[in-house]
């Protein structure tokens, strides 16, 4: 075979390999960190629903805009767009046109990022380009499960002595589990002084979680957000290195403030280390109810906190529903109501 023929073949092979690498590059990079543990997470671009997909019609939300093109501008729906302010993408109900820019998830302009090995926090993600404050970085995706499946998975992982799994609570009874299926967002580490945040958006009636920059991020800088860590057992050491580091992942910020409705329904990302949960003191479950519920005559409603499967507490109003003890109707701060057998739940009365 002539040297020119061999050179041509080698060039063809290189082109084929480059094309193949481009096609599977994302999957290859995602799988690499867990090979030592014989775990290969599957790369996905969209959430996979293992529970019934609750998708409301766009018109039911009543969110739309009437943005018009400003003179000399080529784009619509900037920072003053009604939909964007309410964390909802523009839809067919809006009066804006195809120039609309308030569609961060649909347009899928995912920022360039790289997987790296950190000194103390395992693998992490660094920006591979400059990112401006407020820009969409990536969607947090995984398997969407309910509390029942979440609890079952936690127990299975506990039996396997597995500690690496990733949960993001969308709302009550809906959790994104990126343990086995996800994208690069599952490797973003925690920081007590993060440069990104999770936002819960309504996209064509579907609730989705996006990660957005909270400040300008330089190329090569590690991406972080506050896990709002929820765990079972002792606090875990934090190695974020921030000046305001809380030292423990389970610790709360030093400055306290009143929880707003917006904060109450904000998604909570949890990197959980499983340990046997401590039982609440018996006095917490003391409700002062007799068999007929007479103790509630003077005040039929009380403010309580209910704990979900990953240990996060949700504030709710509880009222007597029947004369059967421990059967109540609760309404959470996001307006969702639920009938609960309180003797099967972990809860406590809010006194403050």
Curated annotation (Swiss-Prot):
Residues 111-228 form the SET domain. Residues 234-250 form the Post-SET domain. It comes from Arabidopsis thaliana (Mouse-ear cress). Its EC number is 2.1.1.-. Belongs to the class V-like SAM-binding methyltransferase superfamily. Histone-lysine methyltransferase family. SET2 subfamily. The lineage of its organism: Eukaryota, Viridiplantae, Streptophyta, Embryophyta, Tracheophyta. Residues 60-109 form the AWS domain. The keyword Protein biosynthesis does not apply. GO terms for molecular function: histone H3K36 methyltransferase activity. GO terms for biological process: methylation; regulation of DNA-templated transcription. This is Putative histone-lysine N-methyltransferase ASHH4. It catalyses: L-lysyl-[histone] + S-adenosyl-L-methionine = N(6)-methyl-L-lysyl-[histone] + S-adenosyl-L-homocysteine + H(+). It comes from the Eukaryota. Histone methyltransferase. GO terms for cellular component: chromatin; chromosome, centromeric region; nucleus. It is found in: Nucleus; Chromosome, Centromere. It is an enzyme of class 2 (transferase). Keywords: Centromere, Chromatin regulator, Chromosome, Methyltransferase, Nucleus, S-adenosyl-L-methionine, Transferase. InterPro entries: ASHR3-like_SET, AWS_dom, Hist-Lys_N-MeTrfase_SET2_plant, Post-SET_dom, SET2_Histone-Lys_MeTrsfase, SET_dom, SET_dom_sf.
């Amino acid at each position: 075979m002539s040297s020119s023929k061999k050179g041509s073949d080698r060039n063809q092979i290189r082109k084929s390999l480059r094309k193949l690498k481009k096609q599977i590059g994302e999957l290859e990079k995602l799988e690499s960190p867990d090979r030592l543990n014989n775990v290969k997470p599957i790369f996905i671009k969209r959430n996979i629903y293992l529970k019934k997909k609750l998708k409301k019609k766009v018109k039911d939300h009543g969110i739309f805009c009437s943005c018009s093109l400003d003179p000399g501008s080529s784009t619509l729906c900037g920072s003053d767009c009604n939909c964007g302010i309410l964390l909802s993408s523009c839809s067919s109900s809006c009066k804006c046109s195809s120039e609309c820019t308030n569609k961060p998830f649909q347009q899928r302009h995912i920022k360039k990022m790289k997987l790296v090995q950190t000194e103390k926090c395992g693998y992490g993600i660094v920006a591979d380009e400059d990112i401006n404050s407020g820009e969409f970085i990536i969607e947090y995706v995984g398997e969407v499960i309910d509390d029942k499946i979440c609890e079952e998975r936690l127990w299975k992982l506990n039996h396997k002595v597995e500690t690496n799994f990733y949960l993001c609570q969308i709302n009550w009874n809906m959790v994104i589990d990126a343990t086995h299926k996800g994208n690069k967002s599952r490797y973003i580490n925690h920081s007590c002084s993060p440069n990104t945040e999770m936002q819960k958006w309504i996209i064509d009636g579907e609730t989705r979680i996006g990660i957005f920059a909270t400040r300008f991020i330089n190329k090569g800088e590690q991406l972080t957000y506050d896990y709002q860590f929820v765990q079972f057992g002792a606090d875990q050491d934090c190695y974020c290195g921030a000046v305001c580091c809380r030292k423990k992942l389970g610790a709360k910020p030093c400055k306290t403030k009143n929880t707003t409705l917006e904060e109450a329904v904000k998604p909570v990302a949890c990197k959980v280390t499983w340990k046997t949960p401590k039982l609440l003191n018996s006095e917490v479950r003391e409700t002062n109810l007799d068999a007929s519920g007479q103790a509630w005559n003077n005040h039929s409603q009380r403010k309580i906190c209910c704990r979900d499967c990953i240990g996060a507490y949700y504030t709710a109003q509880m009222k007597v529903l029947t004369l059967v003890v421990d059967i109540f109707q609760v309404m959470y701060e996001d307006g969702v109501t639920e009938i609960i057998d309180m003797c099967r739940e972990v809860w406590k009365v809010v006194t403050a």
